[in-house]
């Protein structure tokens, strides 16, 4: 009797566990940097998010060193989480010098406009404050804050993620990294991932530590995003 009761209880417990706790395991990466991140670019990365998604899905890609690489098992999901600060700046400066077609692209024109604005000593003070274009000596650090440039980079990130997202097969999360300055030896980086498509994420720009280095302000931004988009 005790044996039968024990078997019943164990069977009931396991069935309950299976219902209450999902048992599927998914493999992915939530912290991937591409050439759009200044640190990755400085370390030699020249691949854009497109290549990151191809690699994650098990496709063969050519690395920044010219070699080919392929995963033995494709991932189930990925978050391309490039740094929100200076996103696309180093990459755009490089493309402007080495890629003649970049100058005529929307992103290239926005990058040039940002550089011209910074070179103008009589730049409209209103544009500086309302456009989040803060004065400093390092143009690469400010140019990315030029609103049109930032929005074009962010829209491109969302566009590529949506292109590779296949519900039920492969999940491409739109995201970025919020990167505050080092404080008391702690960076406290946060990877922000959205469950939404670009139709919603395009309604905002990534909130960075240029906007605020306090994580509570980041949470407030995300709350405003939810209220605005329903995402």
Each predicted region: which residue ranges?
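Sec-dependent N-terminal signal peptides
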Residues: 3-12
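N-terminal signal peptide c-region/cleavage motif recognized by signal peptidases
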Residues: 13-18
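Extended, charged catalytic domains and RNA/DNA-binding interfaces, predominantly
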Residues: 19-231
